Amino acid sequence: MGSRGWLVSAVVGSMLGALTSIALAQDPATQSFSAPLELAPPPAPDSVDQDLIDAAARPAGILKYGPVSLIDPLWDNFNKTIDPLGLKVGLAYTAVYQAASGGPGRRDAAGGDIDLFGDWRLLGEKGGQNNGYLYFAAENRHDLGTGIAPSALGGQIGSLWGTTNGFGEQPLVLKEVYWQQHFGGDRLIVRAGKLDPENYYDSNHWQSDSKYFLNKAFSSFPVRAFPGQGLGANVTAKFGEQMYISTGVQDAQGKKTEAGFDTFFHDFNLFGAFELGFTPTIEGWGKGTYRFTAWYRDAGESDGKPHDGGLVMSIDQRIGPNFIPFFRAGAGEGNINGIEYMVSSGVGWQGQLITESDVWGVAAAWGRPEDHDLNDQYAAEAFYRLQVSPDNQFTIGYQVIVNPSFDPDSHVVGVFEMRWRISI
């Protein structure tokens, strides 16, 4: 059996197994759905679910009002008007500036990202256990007058991976649109449509360059070569109170800027992943999420990219109400991103500092290139995120990149960073 046959058989088999197990666990005569289960795994930091939660929170800042405070009542009234229709909508704008201390190319970059996102309950009642939702997310990305956007800065300074995970340049696109069907609350969730695989496999509490760390070693994990948003399906099933699986297949040549019907139905090159996760609550510490993921990606007939695959793990564990350390490790073939092994670890704080909801984090990473003639690369980052007003967050931070793999003449490169995010 070829790699594609193994991929399809393994993932589809696990999806069917999850569906069957959940179905057998539901006895219509005895099963009660009065208490919905907590989502497992927790929503990824950049998922539509989490973006809606963050937009609605509006925690107090050092200022009572901010640049968009006049819009808040109008946006609130709009969401109240559409709420009876089962519709929720959020809007965010994030701007980033980075300046490097060295490197062979350009040394500063600025970019912006505007996001419109939401979900629409089209099946079931509010608070129901078997509801169906249409999810959507649109995005525009652009530079801010520096000649390059932040996504290109890593290549300019010879880094093995990016100084950000996103913040490139693209027109307005519908990057995600999919159906999400719940069975028994959050015990079983089936998704189908244009999906972002980073939201369903090998996520992490701190995995967001719009909200937390910027360096790609922490805001993503580039030892894994996941494709962009593409057509496919995902099944997430919860077993008991502390175990889940997340598995699925989608277009290996997915791109957020393209619908993907040609590559999915004509080429049928697939990406598949299987994740086993645990969500224990440790007495005296708090809740954690422990993820173990295997993935494989077919070679692309249209984009010419080679096949790739690997194993990754991602752990984040609360220690008390504020500290959340994390650890990630992975190994892959390195055929696409050029990284064979990678480890990252760090800690963050969420809670009372200057304001009640400030965040800081510090982390370090190591990566080994697939080309062993290149240097192993190390990176570290520290940041502080201040809640300026209920809608506005300001982040300042610094990255250190040691032995950038593609610039052997540089031993250490620093990257200063600032970020402003507005979310309503």
Regions found by a protein language model. Name each.
Residues 13, 20-98, 105, 121-127:
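N-terminal periplasmic/intermembrane-space "pro-region" immediately following the signal or transit peptide
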Residues 80-82, 120-126, 180-183, 194, ...:
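Residue-level signature of outer-membrane beta-barrel architecture
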Residues 28, 66, 71-89, 121-134, ...:
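Short loop/turn motifs that connect adjacent beta-strands in outer-membrane beta-barrel proteins
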Residues 277-370, 382:
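Detector for outer-membrane/organellar transmembrane beta-barrel domains
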Residues 95-99, 138-144, 194-199, 249-253, ...:
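Transmembrane beta-strands of outer-membrane beta-barrel pores
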Residues 147-178, 185-271, 275:
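Surface-exposed coil loops of outer-membrane beta-barrel proteins
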Residues 412-424:
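Outer-membrane beta-barrel "beta-signal"
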Residues 87-91, 130-137, 188-191, 233, ...:
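Transmembrane beta-strands of outer-membrane beta-barrel proteins
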